[in-house]
Regions:
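Flexible "arm" and connector segments at domain edges
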Residues: 2-144
Length: 144
């Protein structure tokens, strides 16, 4: 560790860290043949709709990042809150909805079921119908 003013800078052996990361990475995450084997296993042994599920997960991450980038620039970097930027955010939300639809197809569900489940979860978490910081941070067992 190196002391720099009020900050402590840690020195890291990046090669050692990369070796560590490689050691704790699943075979399907590090070997193409294992990834194909896992896809095949999911296809044969379960009713997992892997193409839609993967499309949804990757797309939601990407499009949520694009939406977040606009918000970050407006709130933290001085980008103006204009009708054009609101339109851009709405377009990104539309893309997010498209990927939610992909997830619904993968999970054989509907938007309605997902929203109903969310409402029930939040009613259980906040029985009075009002947000509570303590309940949001200290959840009951099984409250995902």
């Amino acid at each position: 560790m190196i002391r720099c003013g009020v900050f402590l800078l840690m020195t890291v052996d990046t090669e050692k860290y990369l070796d560590f990361v490689a050691g704790v990475t699943s075979p399907a995450s590090s070997d193409f043949a294992e990834l194909l084997r896992r896809f095949t296993e999911l296809e044969v042994k379960s009713d997992c709709d892997t193409p839609h599920l993967l499309t949804a997960a990757l797309g939601l991450a990407a499009e949520s990042g694009e939406f977040t980038e606009i918000v970050k620039k407006i709130i933290l970097q001085g980008k103006p809150y204009t009708p054009d930027n609101v339109f851009h955010m709405k377009r990104e939300l539309g893309d997010i909805c498209w990927y939610i639809a992909q997830a619904c197809m993968a999970l054989d569900t509907t938007f309605d079921e997902i929203i109903e489940m969310n409402v029930e979860k939040l009613k259980t978490r906040y029985p009075g119908g009002e947000f509570d910081v303590h309940k949001s941070e200290n959840r009951k067992v099984g409250d995902l």
